[in-house]
Structures are given as C-alpha cells and as structure tokens.
UniProtKB/Swiss-Prot annotation:
<dbReference type="InterPro" id="IPR050533">
    <property type="entry name" value="HssA/B-like_chaperone"/>
</dbReference>
<dbReference type="InterPro" id="IPR008455">
    <property type="entry name" value="HssA/B-related"/>
</dbReference>
<feature type="compositionally biased region" description="Polar residues">
    <location>
        <begin position="1"/>
        <end position="22"/>
    </location>
</feature>
<protein>
    <recommendedName>
        <fullName>HssA/B-like protein 7</fullName>
    </recommendedName>
</protein>
<dbReference type="GO" id="GO:0030587">
    <property type="term" value="P:sorocarp development"/>
</dbReference>
<dbReference type="Pfam" id="PF05710">
    <property type="entry name" value="Coiled"/>
</dbReference>
<comment type="similarity">
    <text>Belongs to the hssA/B family.</text>
</comment>
<feature type="region of interest" description="Disordered">
    <location>
        <begin position="1"/>
        <end position="23"/>
    </location>
</feature>
Length: 87
C-alpha cells in the first residue's frame, strides 16, 4: 500500500514587462504592458480610468467585445499561468 503525494512548487511571482496569456493551444502575445483576454460575452464597450494626482485621468483598461486590453504591467508565476478575470 502506497501513499501518493502531489507536491506543488510555488515560486515568487516575477514581474512581467511583456504580457502573454494562454490562448487555446497557443499563446497570445501583446505589446508591452498589455494583455488580451477572450470574450466575456455581450457586445459592450467600456473602459476604466485612474484619477491622477494632477487631476488628469489615465485609462487602465478598455473593453470592446471580444477583447480586453489592460494598460499596466502584471505579475505572473514562473509557470506562466495567468487569467484575465472574466467572471
């Protein structure tokens, strides 16, 4: 009788300056500090903004079905797995 153990190795997140996300069997690479996500349904367009200290605004994401584009760096594990937060 044996006991099978699954060991999960978790390493420190690494900062990404060029984002890529899994896209089916391949990988979808975008420009620096952006990430493309698959469709979350609907045909809407939206965007999110940050209010800067000087009163200006910075758009940090935009959505036009079926692609989200995020305008910031994000961290991911060394395994390269990441998700786009479509719920």
């Amino acid at each position: 009788m044996s006991i099978l153990s699954a060991l999960t190795s978790i390493s420190n997140p690494m900062k990404s300056t060029k984002s890529s996300v899994a896209n089916g069997g391949g990988r979808l690479s975008m420009g620096t500090n952006s990430v493309a996500c698959g469709s979350c349904g609907g045909g809407n367009s939206s965007s999110g903004t940050i209010n800067n200290a000087d009163g200006s605004q910075t758009t940090y994401y935009s959505y036009t079905s079926p692609v989200y584009t995020y305008n910031y760096s994000y961290s991911y594990s060394s395994s390269g797995s990441s998700s786009c937060g479509c719920h």
